[in-house]
Amino acid sequence: CALPICPHVSVVMNFTKPTAEKPALLTLGEVETFLHEFGHSLHGMFANTRFESLSGTNVWWDFVELPSQFMENYAVEKDFLRTFAFHYETGEPLPDNLIERIVKSRNFMTAYACLRQVSFGLLDMAYYTKKDAFTEDIIPFEKEAWKKAMIFPQLPDTCMTVQFSHIMAGGYAAGYYSYKWAEVLDADAFSVFKKNGIFDQATAQSFRDNILSKGGTEHPMTLYKRFRGQEPTIDALLERNEIKRNVESK
């Protein structure tokens, strides 16, 4: 049949229930979760491909979280919050200084958190790029893999590998880096919206046409560069996380 098939997409959430005194009020975390899942749903709703197996979220593993994490950026954008974030009794909008404090608190120790995720990705790749059978002591192997990203000394008699279920039984073998890579992509993509306006229709249409509608029909970097005009850099992520780059090592 040549007729297009419209997708059926649902977002199923577990929100805080109302009480006798208060209606159901969303926490910031619930708003972020909704936006995240809504990003996945947009990927499916805007799909325009011939084959279902290449539509929507059926993309490369390290590209699937771009639309979802991209949408999370709106959760702390003042212009977005002004469209709905009002006190349920007084109608008072969410104060700007409160939003700023939330952002500041989220960025506490963010550089350490970043390197922690990078270290996990390095360990993952160290295991899955090893050509010979593993016959070594695990702890020295971990330290060698982590030496580029380790800030604090490892506690004696601790071992990450034995609890690293993501790469052993969770489907992230040789793919744990995709968590941090998705952050690089979503921050870089959202920087275009920050520049042009977070509700700019032309920018949104380009994101839809070049990324959301294409699914897995082309290489992710081809799609991304078509939208962005260049490959992603880490600059937007560092700026969002308020991490100062060492100019000498740039």
PLM regions and their residue ranges:
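Cation-handling catalytic/transport regions enriched in His/Asp/Glu
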Residues: 2-250
